[in-house]
Amino acid sequence: MQKDTKKSATVRAKPIDLATCVEASLHTSLDGFDLPRARLYGVSIVNANGVASHEDGALRISFLAEHGDVYELLDAPSSAIARMFDAAVVLTCGWAAPISRQVDDDHETTDDEVPPSQHPQRRRVRLVVVVCDDGVASVLRFADTPDDIVTDAGSARGSLADAVNNLWCDPKVVVSRESLD
């Protein structure tokens, strides 16, 4: 009896499982929460069944690039190489602070006048975002509670979420002058 290799080749890992597996691996190799530059990695899935249990060897994580500005990193044409992998990973560190909400005249507003880095309740954070054909997921880890993670299975919104989606889904079209002739 022959093994159905086609079926086993189509087993896919969920984005949230990829994110937690990648983050756990990077957490063991990174020093602290103060990386000065955002990093881009490519991930090859070696064993999709081992991703959810964080099995050693389930993923191959390849460093691709880094930049002082996460948005410039994601927008760089050279970052498109990440799409050659099963998933792309963005890792960045920074400050997080609570968003205070106020209700004035039946309208809810947020007080974002104080940057997170200057907020009295600021916390150092490391963010890992994974994007693949099946979606986006992210994992946060705070310096003051390094044994705990906060996960998001794809509901994040905002400029970083848009930039990550654009990296994966919006290939850059480059037309050279020679092709116009």
Tell me the role of every PLM-derived stretch.
Residues 4, 9, 59-64, 151-163:
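Compact, glycine/acidic-enriched structural inserts
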Residues 68-108:
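Short HxH-centered metal-ligating active-site micro-motif
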Residues 24-74:
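N-terminal interaction modules that seed assembly of large macromolecular complexes
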Residues 1-34:
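Short N-terminal edge-element motif at the start of the domain
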